[in-house]
UniProtKB/Swiss-Prot annotation:
Gene coding for it: LYZ
Function comment: Lysozymes have primarily a bacteriolytic function; those in tissues and body fluids are associated with the monocyte-macrophage system and enhance the activity of immunoagents.
EC numbers, comma separated: 3.2.1.17
Complex and partners: Monomer.
Catalytic reaction equation(s): Hydrolysis of (1->4)-beta-linkages between N-acetylmuramic acid and N-acetyl-D-glucosamine residues in a peptidoglycan and between N-acetyl-D-glucosamine residues in chitodextrins
InterPro entries: Glyco_hydro_22, Glyco_hydro_22_lys, Lysozyme-like_dom_sf
A GO molecular-function annotation: lysozyme activity
Any one cellular-component term (Gene Ontology): extracellular region
Species annotation: Syrmaticus soemmerringii
Positions annotated as active site in the UniProt record: 35, 52
Protein name: Lysozyme C
Amino acid sequence: KVYGRCELAAAMKRLGLDNFRGYSLGNWVCAAKFESNFNTHATNRNTDGSTDYGILQINSRWWCNDGRTPGSRNLCNIPCSALLSSDTIASVNCAKKIVSDGNGMNAWVAWRKRCKGTDVNAWTRGCRL
């Protein structure tokens, strides 16, 4: 599923991401835009053999099990395929673990490069939330 900006903001808010660990909803919507272009089915292979999955491009080396990443830690205790679900519940629940892990949203390269230090509130502006 490819979400609309406000549609995703509403879904993320409903799932408790607004101000989770101090990150406003705009941060999450911005991260999703630049990680997956709001597409829940996005997958991208990395040079180390791991793969990033779903709307927040969660990595199989650390966070989920895809059955083909050597030494996968699966810290979210889920199959990576769950991260491709159109309802985003698994992605959001795993993202909460990731952002609580010590590096905050810096765990997402796209957030660090494209969202951090910008006016992320623009990502939720005009949305009925």
